[in-house]
């Protein structure tokens, strides 16, 4: 959305079909959608919500047919979702109206294109440009675009570190500089040790980058929470999101990560693994074609959501069409497959995905915890692991599973 624009939506044409649900042997009311609930919530505490007033009206009901919902600024680009609700329901007549064709126009009134383009130019990053072009439907029609030039485009990479890691960081800084990044290292004894000090430093680097540099594309935090506090931890899961959100809308404006090392030895291990991946120096890279997909024991959710998520990944991404072999464990069989899963992980997998319950020290069922991780023999075959579960990356609680 261009800056300062008022969005006007005009419905140009629509085609719909009305269906009598009795013709399809549907004689009961369609249940209303329920609000989201936490997986940790007891089923006994969940109330079924039903609006008797709406269900008593003899009219077709739907939320706005087409709605624009603003999300915020993503690296100075204001973005929004177009939400389409193509089904209307009349509970009294037991009919639904389905819109199968919608043609509409969005117009941006009083748009300041120059201001929008200047903001984009100030924060241009080839690493965000590909995100914008593939994720924002009207991006190319609003902004001037160009091909990324990874040779000429300066990419700013900021490292925030505790000074105790200065020597251990050198190989990583040298490697990133060799790749072409402009690396700036700020030690907390210089900029301050509090979350506020760090956020203020990063905010200034983004708003007023020095020496004609662009706004940073990457921020790397080096140190565990004992050395560098998380940007957010009060009342919820620990997070560094605030360090990379400069417009207070929960959208990251830089790509942010953390080496949560407690000492230089930990950091050296993390750096060595990272550089090995980026230089493609594995002794046997054949493991990169193997993935491990696990829908764990989560009885009330696993049959639909756990298995569904794993099957979705396999159907669209992790399959022979992409030269990937997926070792898949669906619920309920996954519950008795713990030993087999650990064995496959030790053999090497590029990607491991688990969805079910978790805790700070690991995945719950089938169990895969810190003890298992510390005993692994997959040297040189390190996976990217994704846990769709609670607490496994709570990096403010000793050595959590994500850190181990």
Name each model feature, range by range.
Residues 242-277, 355-404:
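Catalytic cores of nucleophile-dependent amide-cleaving enzymes
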Residues 1-188, 197-218:
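Extracellular pro-sequences of secreted precursors
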Residues 157-185, 252-340:
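A domain-level signal for caspase-like cysteine endopeptidase catalytic cores
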Residues 167-169, 192-196, 227-233, 300-307, ...:
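Extracytoplasmic/secreted cell-surface and envelope-processing proteins
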Residues 85-87, 160-164, 186-191, 221-225, ...:
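Active-site-proximal beta-strand/loop segments in catalytic clefts of secreted hydrolases
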Residues 181-216, 315-351:
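Functional beta-strand-loop-alpha-helix junction segments that form "active/interaction loops"
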Residues 75, 150-153, 210-215, 248, ...:
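Extracellular/periplasmic catalytic domains that process cell-envelope and extracellular macromolecules
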Residues 201-242:
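Hydrophobic or amphipathic alpha-helical targeting/insertion segments
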